[in-house]
Amino acid sequence: MFSQRLLTQTSLFSLASLAASQSAIQFDGRVPAGTQLSAFDSENGLFNPSNVFGKNLTFSQLLQLPDVPPSLFDAGTVPLEVTISDQSIFAPSATNVQLGFRRAELLPASNNGTDPSTSGVKSLHFSLMKDTARPLNLSHEYQLAFVESNDFSTNQFVLKTGTLLDTATQGGVDPDSLILFGNVKQSQILFNTAFTEGVFHNFGLTLDFNANTTQVFYSTGNDPLAQVTEPLTNDISGQGQYHFGVLKKGVNGGADITKDAFQPSGINEGIIFGGIFQEDSSASTITLSPQAGANATAAASNGTAAGCTKKRSVGSIAGRLQYVRED
């Protein structure tokens, strides 16, 4: 089994060593305090201003800056809420109007589908919280965070809530849960937890695009992330783009759920996001909590859940664990 042992030898390492040990940030979607919603309607360096939202809408019409405490990794940055309404009908083209969906999603600005965020070994961070004033309709299935392959053929992972449409996986799963699936072509549940209100749910996903594995770290509130799975075999090939938001699927979809499924009227729903960023994990580390004098990180072990490469700590740099093979 995966194991780790922290050696408290931080005094042996210099500040220069600490600085050199920080993981590189691939993209950063944390919103600086004081940002105006109008900033999201044009190039802003955080999120793509053109996708994904309903025809004739803008992000400043559907985003909110909620009055909630910061999420785990928000320091000098603020949470951002994504909302949907009856007008949230995405139309990628004149012949592809998604009447069966209501959706609005944030895409990282630098994530064009073939950029390095979907190669090597990366750790994706995001937190999300319910808005009790804009509750979801849990008789529907929702996608809240996912990566869509560059050829649009699959989602390599997807975080869902609500009543699952896949009858093979919906049995025994409380609709009021956060359910993390691997590649939707396999419909494997990687992790699930109750979607309790009044608190941020924090996720760290270590995505090894070389080994095709996904490892899950999770916590609530201000608690540091904790490992909740081994690296699990999951096909994350195909590159693509990350989405954070609300994709509400209709019911009774027929042959094409995107166009034919039923959606009720009077929709006013939202999810609050915070702490969205991605770091490089090629050194087999993932940040578990924000820097507070020390950058607390832990191993993101290589391999699969069965027969994974074990690693052990052989030292630390101000809380940053260093690992070697333990075959």
Where are the regions a protein language model picked out?
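Low-complexity, Ser/Thr/Pro/Gly-rich disordered linker/stalk regions
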Residues: F2, A20-G172, G182-V184, D235-R312, ...
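Cleavable N-terminal signal peptides of Sec/SRP-targeted secreted and luminal proteins
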Residues: S3-S21
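Hydrophobic residues embedded in beta-strands of well-ordered beta-sheets
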Residues: V78-L80, D176-L178, N212-T214
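Beta-strand cores of modular interaction/reader domains in eukaryotic scaffold and signaling proteins
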Residues: S127, I179, G204-T206, Q215-F217, ...
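Surface-exposed loop/edge segments in extracytoplasmic proteins
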Residues: S153-N155, S187-F191, D223-E230
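Short, aromatic/His-centered strand-loop micro-motif at the edge of beta-sheets
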Residues: L180-N202
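Localized edge beta-strand/strand-to-loop motifs within extracellular or lumenal beta-rich domains
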Residues: T196-T214, G221-N222
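Juxtamembrane loop segments immediately following a transmembrane helix
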Residues: L207, F217-H243, K249
